[in-house]
């Protein structure tokens, strides 16, 4: 079994604290639409890639991306206070397309419908 390394621990803390920060401290209504789906750290812990999803139309996705860019400095400062790391990683925000991709696959499977299993010949 693989042990959890420092990268994973720091990523988990950033995800947890950032989610709480969005819910409780940031007053931008655009970020209410966002859900943090994951954080990936570089090996040197200098960059945290934050992935988020937004349910809704394309316009909401764009607005949430803009809101993250505008709040970037505030978010980084607040996370630095909470995490107590020697070096606060640079935050990069990315839209997580896996949910949209999953919905697309699901709709295609629904269109196809259930597959009939081939009948076995009687002996």
UniProtKB/Swiss-Prot annotation:
Family: Belongs to the RbfA family.
UniProt protein name: Ribosome-binding factor A
MF annotations from Gene Ontology: ribosomal small subunit binding
Assembly information from the UniProt record: Monomer. Binds 30S ribosomal subunits, but not 50S ribosomal subunits or 70S ribosomes.
Known role: One of several proteins that assist in the late maturation steps of the functional core of the 30S ribosomal subunit. Associates with free 30S ribosomal subunits (but not with 30S subunits that are part of 70S ribosomes or polysomes). Required for efficient processing of 16S rRNA. May interact with the 5'-terminal helix region of 16S rRNA.
Domain of life: Bacteria
Chief localization: cytoplasm
UniProt organism field: Desulfatibacillum aliphaticivorans
UniProt subcellular location: Cytoplasm
Gene3D superfamilies, sorted: 3.30.300.20
This protein's record includes keyword Heme: no
Cellular component, GO annotation: cytosol
């Amino acid at each position: 079994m693989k042990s959890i390394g420092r990268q994973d621990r720091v990523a988990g803390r950033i995800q947890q604290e950032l989610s709480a920060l969005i819910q409780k401290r940031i007053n931008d209504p655009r970020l209410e639409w966002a859900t943090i789906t994951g954080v990936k750290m570089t090996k040197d812990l200098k960059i945290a890639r934050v992935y988020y999803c937004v349910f809704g139309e394309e316009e909401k996705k764009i607005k949430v991306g803009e809101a993250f860019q505008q709040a970037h400095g505030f978010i980084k400062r607040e996370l630095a206070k909470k995490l107590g790391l020697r070096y606060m990683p640079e935050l990069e925000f990315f839209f997580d397309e896996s949910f949209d991709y999953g919905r697309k696959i699901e709709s295609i499977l629904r269109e196809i419908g259930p597959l009939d299993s081939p009948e076995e010949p009687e002996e």
